[in-house]
Amino acid sequence: CQMAEKSLMQAVEHAKNAAGTSTKIIGSIAPLEDCYKPELFPGRDAAISEFAYLGGEMVEAEVDILILETMNSMAETEAGLCALKNTDLTLWVSFVLKDENHLLSGDRLDDTLNMLNNFQIEMVLLNCNPLGRTKNAVDNIVDNWSDGWGIYPNLGIGEPSADGCITEYESMEKYLSVVEYALSGG
């Protein structure tokens, strides 16, 4: 763990040096086991303990914002937020989706967004989703979330591969049309 802690401290230090004072540094915590396998969630108690540890490391590293990134289930998102709510860091959450209405776990996106109202979340994002799914989900975000939101979709065609290799890409025109749709508020 000491090597990981040292690497985190150095990474944040390098980011701050490169960014200067006007850019916020975001610390990211992904699902504890696998972004694309919600069934591997270790359970609430184990998750709260691990998220609290990771959040403490991010606080010590002095990141400005903490994002629970590529969250795939409501239970893991809630456990993470319970563990992080007292960090005094700005909190963001991003979700990977099964379709425009459901997280990868099958949990309803609107129910999950409603759960977020129990916490102080500055930003909700959709990430690691194909362009079409992202575009279709924008309306769900607009209808069910009144605070800040955004998207950063995958450019790869189809579902993410286990090895992370993207072999086919969407056109820049299609990407820009999804961005324009999101900017127009759905």
Short names for language-model regions:
Residues 1-186:
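Domain-level signal for soluble alpha/beta catalytic cores
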